[in-house]
């Protein structure tokens, strides 16, 4: 385990474990407790995280009749009773509805509600995970981990006894080393209680993936990093830590610890061997992270403000440039611009400023944005001017109407990059929308305030 940092809160999660000859003689939370830092949250669907734990690990809900049942370990400290789940779910589907906290603090995880970003399920909630998505074998016994697909997430915004402000804490997780992507963000840890982005340093969570928009490690990833809100960090340098290696183990142990102006990343093979230290030092060299402003909610599978564009959802896009934070991307006929929109605006304007997220017309890894009030018409660029145009089915339009979001270049929200012209982003310039580059021959390519002008806060749509 990681060396202790003053007063500490320990969190543990074990959602997928590799087959091993036997369980270790002490559970992860027993080990933390022996070091004077008992778990305040302990989530695991494959096994008990305390040797003495006999309570429920998780709850599943049956698709055929909506009935639920709890899955417990076979014996104190043991592997989950997958046989009970298989019997209960026979002939139908099951979802994981609750992941219980084994620490005794009641910090259970349930379906994440809508936050800064809305989810794909009803009323904007995130999806629940399939109960059979991540089968594993532990100590010769079948168990099920939690398979997190994009749009799946769990959360507790009222967690008890978790670290807040600049208090110290430790986070530990066992993860599937083959299941990751470059989206933002697969996290487990401490996040905002509101589900909104409340600023740098307001969360501290384990991240695993190969997103390169902010921090990176050596090689091409995936890496263990820390999501501290508005940035993924691998060390002191906000851009790169060459000591944070790309990992290729089938199952990975990941740990992040943080205290006042000190934090650490550790990781290793979950099947055997010790953890290695990838970083141990001062907080990142960026504003807002020293001191930290942690809020104490718990998340799994999502970013602190529920970040992940979801196909089928409806969104509005707000400018983040200081001059223009009440202005949203809207259209007037085929012209795309920014307009001041609020809850008191007309119904017509609210619709003009609302967009449905669709699978990218040219690339399914990215997105296209369909007008709410003009169905089958999409945002696209023509001579780098953004327009609203009806989908004529042509390859040219599909490419011009496909965009790839990434973390906002100014640290806020998202920047939306053209798939067909990867150096160009959604930008407002004189209140008109362009596909602009950071410097170039066009007036709208002016590098002044570029990062602010291409960063957008994504929220639930006005209509």
From Swiss-Prot:
SUPFAM superfamilies: AbfB domain (SSF110221), Concanavalin A-like lectins/glucanases (SSF49899)
InterPro entries: A-L-arabinofuranosidase_B_cat (IPR015289), ABFB (IPR038964), AbfB_ABD (IPR007934), AbfB_ABD_sf (IPR036195), ConA-like_dom_sf (IPR013320)
pH influence on activity: Optimum pH is 4.7.
Chain intervals for the UniProt region annotation (Catalytic): 27-308
Primary location group: secreted
Region (ABD): 309-463
GO MF term (any one): alpha-L-arabinofuranosidase activity
Catalysis: reaction(s): Hydrolysis of terminal non-reducing alpha-L-arabinofuranoside residues in alpha-L-arabinosides
Pathway: Glycan metabolism; L-arabinan degradation
Keyword vocabulary terms for this entry: Carbohydrate metabolism, Disulfide bond, Glycoprotein, Glycosidase, Hydrolase, Polysaccharide degradation, Secreted, Signal, Xylan degradation
Broad enzyme group: hydrolase
Gene Ontology terms: cellular component: extracellular region
Pfam families tied to this protein: AbfB, ArabFuran-catal
Known glycosylation sites: 81, 280, 332
GO biological process, alphabetically ordered: arabinan catabolic process; L-arabinose metabolic process; pectin catabolic process; xylan catabolic process
The EC number(s) this enzyme carries: 3.2.1.55
UniProt keyword annotation of Lipid metabolism present: no
Domain remarks: Organized into two domains: an N-terminal catalytic domain and a C-terminal arabinose-binding domain (ABD).
Function field: Secreted alpha-L-arabinofuranosidase that actively hydrolyzes p-NP-alpha-L-arabinofuranoside and is specific for furanose configuration of the carbohydrate ring. Also exhibits significant activity against polymeric arabinose-containing substrates such as arabinan and arabinoxylan, a major component of plant hemicellulose.
Protein name: Alpha-L-arabinofuranosidase B
Annotated source species: Penicillium canescens
Gene symbol of the encoding locus: abfB
């Amino acid at each position: 385990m990681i060396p202790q940092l003053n007063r500490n809160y320990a969190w543990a999660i074990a959602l997928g474990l590799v087959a091993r000859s036997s369980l270790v003689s002490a559970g992860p939370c027993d080990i933390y407790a022996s070091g004077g830092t008992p778990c305040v949250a302990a989530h695991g669907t494959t096994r008990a995280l305390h040797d003495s734990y006999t309570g429920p690990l998780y709850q599943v809900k049956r698709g055929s009749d909506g009935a639920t049942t709890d899955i417990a370990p076979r014996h104190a400290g043991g592997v989950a009773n997958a046989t009970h789940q298989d019997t209960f779910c026979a002939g139908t589907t099951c979802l994981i509805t609750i992941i219980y906290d084994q620490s005794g603090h009641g910090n259970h995880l349930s379906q994440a509600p809508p936050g800064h970003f809305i989810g794909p399920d009803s009323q904007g909630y995130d999806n629940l995970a399939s109960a059979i998505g991540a089968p594993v074998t532990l100590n010769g016994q079948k168990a099920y981990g939690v398979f997190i697909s994009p749009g799946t997430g769990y959360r507790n915004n009222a967690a008890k006894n978790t670290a807040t402000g600049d208090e110290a804490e430790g986070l530990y997780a066992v993860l599937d080393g083959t299941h990751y992507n470059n989206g933002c963000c697969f996290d487990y840890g401490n996040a905002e209680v509101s589900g909104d982005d409340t600023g740098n340093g307001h969360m501290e969570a384990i991240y695993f993936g190969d997103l390169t928009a902010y921090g990176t490690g050596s090689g091409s990833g995936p890496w263990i990093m820390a999501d501290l809100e508005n940035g993924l960090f691998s060390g002191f340098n906000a851009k790169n830590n060459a000591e944070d290696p790309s990992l290729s183990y089938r199952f990975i142990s990941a740990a992040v610890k943080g205290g006042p102006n000190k934090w650490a990343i550790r990781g290793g093979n979950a099947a055997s061997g010790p953890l290695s230290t990838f970083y141990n030092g001062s907080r990142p060299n960026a504003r807002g992270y020293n001191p930290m402003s942690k809020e104490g909610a718990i998340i799994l599978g999502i970013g602190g403000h529920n970040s992940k564009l979801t196909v089928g959802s409806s969104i509005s896009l707000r400018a983040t440039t200081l001059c223009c934070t009440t202005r949203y991307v809207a259209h007037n006929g085929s012209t795309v611009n920014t307009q001041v929109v609020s809850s008191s605006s007309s119904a017509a304007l609210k619709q003009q400023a609302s967009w449905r997220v669709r699978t990218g017309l040219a690339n399914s890894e990215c997105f296209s944005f369909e007008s709410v009030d003009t169905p089958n018409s999409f945002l696209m660029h023509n001579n780098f001017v953004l327009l609203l145009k009806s989908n004529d089915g042509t390859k040219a339009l599909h490419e011009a109407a496909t965009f790839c979001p990434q973390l906002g270049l100014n640290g806020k929200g998202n920047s939306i990059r053209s798939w067909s012209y990867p150096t160009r982003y959604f930008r407002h310039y004189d209140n008109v929308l362009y596909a602009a580059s950071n410097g170039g021959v066009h007036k709208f390519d002016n590098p002044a305030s570029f990062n602010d002008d291409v960063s957008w806060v994504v929220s639930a749509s006005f209509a």
